[in-house]
Every structure is written in C-alpha cells, then in structure tokens.
C-alpha cells in the first residue's frame, strides 16, 4: 500500500535517522556532538511540556544534562518562533529553515504573507522536513455504501448490493465512512461522531440520502452539514451538522421522493417540518493538532429549540477491518484502569484516547452482523452495530464488558437547555511507552486543551488573512474561506486494488475472459491514496476531469498537495498503459476532457518563486505521461484521421440530442466540436510545457514543433478553406456545432446552441516575444511550417501578427469569429445569465432543437435546473444550468485574448446594452456574476439558496454556504450535489484574483494569469 504523504528524513543521530518524535526514545547511542541536530529536531514540535519530557528522557543519553538540553532547544525555538495573535511564542521550524532567504527553499507556491504564518511554517516543515502534519486529516468518506468498490453483486447494482440500512451492521471492504470524521492517511484508525436524539430508529453514524433509483433526480444526500473551516495541514478543522430533535423522517423522504416525477422539485429534509420552531441541535465539531500526533476533538452541541432536549453524543474510534482475511494482525482498542483507551496497531503504533469526564466507553468489533443481515452466524459475539444496539435498543449484552474491541465510543448523555450549549472533548495521542505515557497522563485533557484549540483558531485566521485581498468585503472573504475549507474537507482516502477486486469477482480478463464486468481492462490499478473528491457523499470517488479543476483552489492553500494530485493521476497505477487517464469508478474507461496538461501548467505557474530544479522535474515527469495521453487521444478518438475528434459525452452528460457515449441511432459517427476544441487546447498546453522544458533541455524544441503542427492541423480542420456543409463552423450562425457524419458519407450540423459551441473559444494561447527570441531555431522552423501550410491559417487568428507588447496568438477563432461567438455568449436572452454563462442557450426554451430518426423524435430544450430524463443517472443537467468549470475556462480564455488584443478590442456587454467593455472587463463581469451566486444581494439573500427562507433569513443558517454541483440558469439557485466544492470551489480563486488584479497585471503577468499573484515580488514571479 502506498501512502500519499510519506514521512521525509529527520536528522541523523549517532548513525540513525530520526523520522518521528516518537522514535527519539529508541536511540541509545546518540553522541553529544549531535546534540544541536537533536535540539533542532525537537523544535519541530509544539509545546514546551513535550520538549521538557523529551529532554528529561534523552539528555542523559547524549552526554548532557536536562537543563542544558532544554536551554538549547529553547534558544533555537526562540530564534525560530513567531508570535501568535495572543502573544504566545510557538515552536516553528528550525533555525536553519526560519532564516532561509532563497525562495526556492521555501514551500512551492506559498506567498510571502502565507509563509510568515504559523500554518505556513507547518506546511514548510511538512514539505521540506517531512514532519507528518498531514498524516491525520478529514480523510473519511461520507458514504462508502453504494459504491462500486463495495459491490460484489452479480449484476453490478452497486446501490442495492450495499445499502444505507446495511451499513451500520456490515463491514466495509475498501474504506470507511462517518460524520465529521478523520483518519490517518492509510485509514487504519478512524475517528468520527455518532449521535442519537432519543427518537430516531437508528444511531446516527453516517449521512442519509436517497439512492439513484429512489430520488426523482437521482441520488441525493438528505442532511444539512457544512464545512466551516480547515487548514491545509489540518491543524484546525471545523464542521457543523444540523441534527433534528424529532425522529428523522427516513421513510417519508424515500416514499415521497419516489412518487415525484422528474419535472417536480425534490422533497428535501427541510420540507418535512423537522426544523420547525428551531427544534434541532447545531452540532459543531472542531479538531486541533497540538502536534502531528496529538489531536484534540471538541464537540459543542447548541440547542436551538424552545425547550430542553436530550442528546446522546458518541465520539467513536475504530479500525478499518484489514484483518478479514486472517493474514493481517488484528489491532485492539482496550480500556485501561484510568478510563482511557489504549489503541494498538502493528503499523500505526500505539495511541491513547481520552474522553470527557463522565463518559462511558462502549466496545465492540468492526465485524459484520451476519445474523441480522443474512440469518447466518457471526464470527464474533460483538459486531459492528453493537453500540447502536446498546444505545438505541438498550441491549447491554451488545457491547463487550471486558472493555476491548476494534470499535469503541465514548457515550455521553446530555440534557441541553433551550438556547444553551454543552461540550464533549476527546484527545488522541501517539504513545511511546518510555516517554509519552507520562505526557498523556498529565496533558490528556489538561488546561492546555482550550489553549491549543484557541491558538489553532487564531492561526487559521492569520493564514486566511494572508490569502485574502484587503479590499474584499467581509461576506466575500467568508465565502472564499468556506470554499477553501470545503476543498480541504473533501479529501478522502481512496482505496481500490482493481486486480484483486476482479479476482474476487472471478472476472479477471486474464483468468476469466468470458465474464463481462465493469473496469475489466483496468486491472493494473492499485489506488490507495488521499485524493480530492468531487463530493464525499454524492461522488465519493475521484473524477479525473473534476480533479484537474480542483487544482485551482487547492493551489491557493497547498501547492504540494496540488502537484501530488496531478502526479497521482499520471502515475503507473492510475494511468492506463495505453495512455488513457481513468475517468471514475463506475467506468474508468469513459472519456473526460483532456484538461490535465492545463492543470499541470496551472500548478506550475501558481508557484510564486523562481522555478528551480524540483519544478522542472515535476514538469518533465508530467510531460512524459501527458505525451502518452495525447497519443492515446490521437490514435483512439480521431477515427477518420482528419483531426476531427469524438470522445463521447466528454463530461457534459446530456448536452447532446443523443447520448454521445452510445452508438448513434443513425449509424455513422459524431465529429464533436468540443472534443476537437479540447484537443486544440491540449496541443497548446503541451506546446507551452515543451517550451518551458526547452529552457533547460533543447531537445524539447522538437516536441514543441510537433504540438504547433498538431494545433494548426486541428484548428484548420474545424473550419476548412471554402464554405462546406460538413465543417463545424457555421458561417451563417456564427457558431460551432457538432457534425453528424452518416454511413453514406453525407453530413449535417446538429444546430444546438450549447456549451459545445463555446469550448472552441477556450482554445487560445499567447506566446511572448521573449520566447520567440529565446528559441530562434524553433521560431524559424515554425515560420517555415506555416509558410508551407498557408491553407491552415486562412480562417484562424494570424499567429505571425504581433499584438500588444509583441505577443503572438494561437487561437481557433480569428477576430471576426471571436466577435460573433462573444455576441451570442454575452446575450442575456441566450447564454448570459445573471450568474454566469449557461450551458445551453435560453433561446431553446421556445425553440427546442428536434432531430427525427425514422419515427423517433429526439429533442433538446432549455432546462435551467434539474434534468427531466434519466440520462447519465438523471442527477446532472447540461441543458441550461450554469457550471463553474467551463465558465472558468472561458474567463481564462478572455484574459488570454486580452493579453493579445489589449484595450483595442472592445465588445458590447451585455449584447444590445450599448455598453462597451474590454475583454478584461468582460472576464471580470463574468467572474462577478459567478461570485454573486454565493453573496448576499441587495435584499440580503444568497441566490444559491433560492426561495428557502430558513437558509436566507435565519441567523444560524444564512452565513453557512453550500457549494453546489451546478446552478439554476435563471436565478442561480444551487442544484445537484450540495457539497461539490470540488470544481465549484474555483470561486475562491475568482474572488481572490479579481479582488486585487488590475488590467495592467493581466497585460504584463508572466505565465498563466489565472494563476498569477499580482503582488508577489519579481523574484517570486512565474516565468
């Protein structure tokens, strides 16, 4: 098993390498000469009590006394310290790190203000020294049931093979889930919250939602929870869950939604009345790390109702069942005489768990209750749902009286008065028998618990203050911070050994070639990493093209993790040997847009410092794998060899008149405007990568020329010389369309005015005059190629015509086409909504597109909210709503065009308004429209919440923001998955960028402007 965050080397003491605080005790031959190295290592940890405990134990062994060692570490700590808001001196990185002046030695991508914060120092310690600050994090899924990984059915019906009702009793095979949960980065040890209000039929251990067949618009979580705060090392995290005091209406939600048609609204939890009179609890969960292996958990329960109410609060600790096959040692959770739990694991080591005074520890096993589910015999007398049976059903025999197991919960029964709050606390600490037991005994829930918690809150404030433009309103700053918190909470441990899974299904293609099963051709895959999820309930699996967009907001807070995500998708245990990037677990072989080269460029340019060796290594390694992916596209998705690409749905689900992933009802093939434009953009991105690499290795100039040629051949094919009826550009309409090429060789354009026709706008790159001067040989070869292939350039932007500041442009659209496409896009009766660019023109509301095949009528009409069909599961819709990823690429393209045309190009925005804007102003206008979805408007309402009054007016709801999957095409209300902070989290970058950037910045910024930091120093600028 591979881990995403590996622990780097520590100092060498007496010939040994110390990799963790807990290992200090094991070294007996440390020499006095290495005392300074040891002391510097100690400064990586947080509290002086730890420092003294360590010094007391080790000093005699290194030939020094305790006072000398404490004095030395204290002196180094003083030199390395930074002061928090309350004036407390905190341990930071070592003296060596704190006094570095070369930006190349810092954390990749950190701004100088971020670098000065306590959280910035922790990031540096993690990335440079390997201090395991990221080892524990919010890596627990919010839904493991109903996933492909857990599906062992004969028919591939994942939703019904492993249900929510079974989840409390049935052991998972590949992961775990929970409420407000954390785990280590290999998910051996998990911590989460369970609740019971005394009325629910089951213990609330996981979020409830409808399966795909139960919801009138597909799967849908039916809970209210919010990712309020998080830092990139997860030193501070905050999560809020709204728990009704009445019995949770499980049956009502299922039965009512099943009765509703696809044209009706969904029946939501708030519609059931369980929040009437504010009869609910706000359950706030906070985590803070005193050091990487000392984690504090505080659960504060606020009774918002008019009467006192009872609630059972059960912080729960358990091990993922890795011992099911009998080949792995079973870990243990065992109560000691002081009422704490000692957690022992053969890989993770020993930990101690301490809970609030008065808690009763309940123990059981993370084993399936076969008797309940299947009428069989249980392997152990105590099973996974034993704590549920004890709390809800009062069965004292359901938990182990011996105080031992693999799952344990600290049971607190609270009576919370109306309008008041009560708190439960837990502490999880790594144990070293000789050193840390004494520390745990004195510190576990001591006075410093609240000090640590408050300190980490303040440090989180400082970190986000360093990211936030000073000019932002408080509301904008809050939305930006919540978006980034959502990105960080959406990390998940994703475990899937496809080779083993196929063997277990007796469907491995090399061993059982006759059985058909999804993902049979992906048996090379071995996933066991921390990955950014689109939504940890609705989409608790990675989606390749989503992940590329996740890199935009993630790079703002954790550039190293961002690069890790790109490297994962391009690694040999993800990327198919043929070069295809895996799509998602329902079908790894589906085809998503090729945006990973763009994401690689973004991650590179987002690093505000001089690019050093590690950056070039990152680019070089990514480029090699992206070259494989590009070749796969050229060989597999250009069937005619005419540089006109297909690819299927390409992430846009139901946008076409036909299911673009299925065989066409007409026969023939579909030449896709978006697929072809994606490849034009891919070529441009690979060209830019090759040029960057050619600065250190001239051999990449040949590859740069290759991608120049690819771009012009692809772009030229989209609009060939002369007016022909089978090309994608429609001169009469001034728009791009898919072309249906029939078996008899005839062709017709599918005149749907959709996002498909806007994606060619995004295929634009600007080349600086410095690049032309730096590579004279390449420039001459490109010029020679263009002179020999003049026909390719007739309908494209002239690549040899200098623009502002001598820039050259590579674009599918020349100036005339750009104006015509923008006129449509900026028309409020067509694409431009108050909250961004729609995925389908509103003109199709009154004029749906109809295509008839024999007697069957296919139709595409404007649907601003949910889909009215079951295509692609029925829970997404690209026929009208606003989606962030394409809007982001449009904004990026407008900024590129502005860099070339400057202020000389203006256009009416909105179309027909008489108001002329530069392309920078258009980009900012689009960004403002997108951002406005989440901000309070002049009426004090947030468009994202539509007409839901409680979310708009209630002081305990109105400032909590959900980042939905997509948004109503007319009013901006959130639709689809409610926590798809993933690509919707890109709003954070839009808020930050346009909160401080100027047109002059856009004209002169090196690299990609979307990744630009306007106020970084010259030495810190991307090149």
Predicted regions and their residues:
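Acidic, mature catalytic/reactive cores of soluble proteins
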Residues: 55, 86, 95, 100-106, ...
């Amino acid at each position: 098993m591979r881990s995403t965050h590996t622990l780097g080397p520590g100092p060498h003491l007496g010939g040994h390498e110390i990799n963790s605080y807990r290992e200090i005790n094991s070294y007996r031959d440390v020499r006095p000469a290495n005392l300074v190295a040891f002391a510097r290592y100690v400064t990586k940890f947080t509290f002086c009590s730890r420092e003294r405990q360590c010094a007391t134990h080790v000093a005699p062994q290194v030939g020094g006394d305790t006072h000398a060692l404490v004095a030395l570490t204290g002196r180094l700590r003083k030199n390395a310290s930074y002061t928090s808001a309350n004036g407390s001196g905190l341990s930071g990185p070592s003296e060596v790190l704190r006094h570095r002046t070369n930006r190349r030695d810092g954390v990749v991508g950190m701004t100088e203000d971020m670098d000065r914060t306590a959280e910035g120092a922790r990031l540096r310690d993690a990335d440079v020294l390997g201090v395991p600050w990221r080892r524990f994090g919010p890596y627990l899924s919010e839904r493991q049931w109903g996933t492909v990984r857990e599906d062992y059915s004969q028919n591939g019906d994942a939703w019904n093979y492993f249900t929510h009702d079974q989840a409390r009793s049935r052991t998972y095979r590949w992961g775990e889930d929970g409420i407000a949960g954390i785990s280590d980065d290999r998910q051996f040890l998990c911590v989460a919250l369970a609740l019971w209000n005394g009325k629910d039929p089951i213990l609330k251990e996981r979020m409830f939602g409808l399966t795909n067949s139960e919801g009138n618009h597909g799967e849908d979580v039916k809970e209210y929870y919010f990712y309020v705060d998080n830092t990139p090392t997860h030193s501070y995290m905050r999560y809020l869950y709204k728990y009704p005091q009445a019995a949770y209406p499980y049956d009502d939600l299922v039965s009512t939604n099943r009765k509703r048609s696809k044209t009706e609204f969904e029946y939501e939890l708030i519609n059931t009345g369980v929040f009437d009179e504010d009869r609910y609890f706000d359950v706030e969960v906070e985590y803070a790390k005193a050091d990487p292996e000392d984690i504090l958990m505080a659960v504060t329960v606020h009774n918002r109702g008019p009467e006192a109410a009872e609630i059972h609060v059960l912080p729960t600790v358990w091990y993922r069942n890795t011992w099911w096959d009998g080949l792995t040692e079973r870990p243990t959770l065992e109560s000691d005489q002081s009422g704490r739990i000692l957690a022992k694991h053969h890989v993770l080591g020993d930990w101690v768990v301490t809970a609030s005074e008065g808690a009763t520890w309940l123990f059981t096993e993370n084993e399936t209750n076969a008797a309940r589910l299947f009428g069989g015999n249980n392997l152990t007398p105590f099973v996974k749902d034993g704590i549920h049976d004890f709390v809800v059903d009062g069965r004292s025999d359901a938990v182990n009286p011996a105080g031992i197991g693999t799952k344990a919960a600290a049971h607190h029964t609270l009576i919370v008065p109306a309008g008041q709050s009560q708190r439960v606390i837990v502490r999880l600490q790594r144990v070293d028998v000789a050193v840390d037991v004494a520390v745990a005994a004195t510190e576990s829930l001591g006075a410093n618990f609240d000090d640590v918690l408050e300190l980490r809150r303040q440090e989180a404030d400082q970190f986000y203050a360093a990211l936030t433009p000073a000019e932002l309103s408080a509301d904008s700053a809050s939305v930006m911070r919540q978006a980034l918190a959502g990105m960080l909470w959406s990390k998940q441990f994703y475990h899937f050994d496809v080779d083993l899974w196929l063997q277990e299904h007796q469907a491995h293609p090399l061993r059982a070639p006759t059985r058909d099963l999804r993902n049979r051709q992906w048996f090379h895959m071995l996933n066991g990493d921390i990955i950014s999820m689109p939504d940890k309930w609705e989409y608790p699996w990675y989606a390749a093209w989503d992940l590329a967009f996740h890199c935009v907001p993630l790079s703002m807070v954790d550039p190293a993790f961002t690069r890790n995500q790109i490297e994962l998708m391009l690694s040999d245990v993800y990327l198919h040997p043929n070069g295809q990037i895996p799509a998602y677990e329902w079908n790894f072989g589906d085809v998503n847009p090729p945006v990973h080269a763009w994401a690689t460029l973004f991650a590179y340019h987002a690093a505000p410092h001089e690019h050093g060796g590690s950056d070039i290594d990152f680019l070089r390694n990514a480029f090699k794998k992206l070259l494989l992916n590009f070749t796969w596209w050229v060989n597999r998705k250009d069937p005619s060899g005419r540089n006109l690409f297909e690819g299927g749905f390409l992430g846009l689900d139901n946008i076409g008149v036909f299911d673009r992933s299925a065989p066409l009802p007409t026969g023939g093939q579909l030449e896709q405007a978006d697929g072809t434009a994606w490849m034009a953009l891919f070529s441009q991105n690979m060209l830019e990568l090759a040029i960057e690499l050619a600065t250190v290795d001239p051999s990449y100039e040949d590859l740069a020329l290759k991608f120049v040629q690819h771009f012009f051949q692809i772009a030229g094919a989209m609009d060939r010389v002369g007016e022909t009826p089978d090309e994608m550009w429609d001169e009469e309409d001034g728009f791009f369309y898919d072309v249906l090429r029939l078996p008899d060789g005839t062709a017709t354009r599918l005149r749907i005015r959709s996002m498909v026709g806007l994606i060619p706008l995004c295929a634009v790159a600007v080349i600086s005059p410095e690049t032309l001067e730096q590579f004279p040989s390449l420039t001459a070869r490109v010029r020679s190629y263009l002179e020999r292939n003049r026909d390719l350039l007739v309908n494209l932007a002239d690549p040899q015509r200098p623009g502002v500041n001598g820039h050259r442009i590579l674009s599918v659209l020349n100036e005339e086409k750009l104006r015509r496409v923008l006129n449509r896009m900026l028309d409020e009766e067509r694409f431009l909504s108050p909250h961004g660019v729609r995925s389908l023109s509103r003109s199709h509301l009154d004029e749906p597109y109809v295509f008839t095949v024999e007697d069957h009528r296919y139709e595409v009409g404007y649907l601003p909210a949910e889909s009215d069909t079951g295509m692609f599961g029925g829970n997404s819709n690209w026929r009208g709503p606003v989606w962030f990823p394409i809007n982001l690429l449009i904004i990026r393209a407008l900024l590129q065009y502005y860099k070339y045309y400057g202020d000389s190009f203006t256009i009416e925005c909105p179309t027909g308004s008489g108001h002329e804007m530069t392309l920078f102003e258009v980009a900012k206008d689009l960004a403002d429209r997108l951002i406005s979805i989440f901000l309070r408007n002049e009426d004090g309402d947030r468009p994202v919440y539509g007409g839901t009054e409680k979310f708009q007016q209630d002081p305990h709801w109105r400032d909590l923001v959900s980042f939905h999957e997509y948004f109503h095409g007319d009013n901006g209300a959130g639709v689809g998955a409610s926590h798809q902070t993933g690509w919707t989290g890109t709003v954070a970058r839009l808020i930050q960028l346009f909160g401080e950037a100027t047109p002059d910045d856009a004209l002169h910024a090196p690299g990609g402007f979307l990744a630009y930091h306007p106020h970084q120093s010259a030495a810190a600028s991307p090149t």
